[in-house]
Curated annotation (Swiss-Prot):
The gene is Sgf11. It is found in: Nucleus, Nucleoplasm; Cytoplasm. This is SAGA-associated factor 11 homolog. The keyword Electron transport does not apply. GO terms for cellular component: cytoplasm; DUBm complex; nuclear pore; nucleoplasm; SAGA complex. It comes from Drosophila mojavensis. Residues 153-211 are annotated as: Disordered.
């Protein structure tokens, strides 16, 4: 402390050039060089000059280290620079060597993936999702046949129900009487018999060679 006080008093007496180069207690390289040259002009001030130079260099080094550590701590790089201790590394970052597990202890076995059917909202395995969706939506060959059969039966049932309803509404008369139906049936039967008789007669004449 005495050396620094003596240095400051000597600087104040030597001139104001060094004070102009000093800004808020922080000395630049040119200011330190200028002050050192002024101190070594006199033989009595050699010790003060050496102390002054050493103190300036020490302050500069300490300030640089302090600023660097402060920057590393604020940015979070101080831990990365220092590293992790061996005890903490073994406990927190232990490598897993078990079968079917990676180095972090996560299972490497392939898990079966499930898919949700958009039609019935059921969970189906991914390998069977396509056939299930085909059957569920009636888009396959067999499913389309079954769906067409169901549609045909529904249409037949609706047609039969509509015909019965029209028959009931008309009071059982569908355009003709029972007598007319009987006459048509008997006339058709007579026509069939006449055609059969004519065929039989023609075959008998051919057998008897009557032309």
């Amino acid at each position: 402390m005495s050396a620094s006080n003596a240095t400051h008093t000597h600087l104040s007496s030597s001139g104001g050039a060094s004070q102009m180069a000093t800004t808020q207690g922080h000395l630049t390289a040119s200011a330190i060089t200028l002050n050192f040259r002024e101190l070594i002009k006199e033989p009595k001030g050699l010790e003060d000059a050496a102390n002054y130079l050493f103190q300036g260099l020490l302050d500069d080094v300490v300030a640089g280290i302090f600023i660097e550590i402060h920057h590393l701590r604020k940015t979070g790089n101080l831990t990365a620079l220092d590293g992790v201790g061996e005890e903490n590394a073994e406990s927190a970052y232990r490598i897993c060597e078990m079968p079917n597990l990676d180095i972090f202890g996560i299972s490497t076995a392939k898990k079966p993936m499930d898919c949700t059917c958009p039609h019935c909202d059921r969970l189906v395995a991914a390998a069977r999702f396509a056939p299930h969706l085909e059957k569920c939506m009636g888009m396959g060959r067999i499913s389309s046949r079954i769906a067409s059969r169901r549609l045909a039966t529904k249409e037949g049932a609706s047609a039969s129900s509509s015909s019965t309803s029209t028959y009931i509404q008309s009071g059982g008369n569908t355009g003709g009487t029972d007598d007319e139906d009987d006459v048509d049936w008997s006339s058709d039967k007579r026509k069939k018999k006449s055609t059969q008789n004519s065929r039989n007669n023609g075959s008998k004449k051919n057998n008897g060679k009557i032309f």
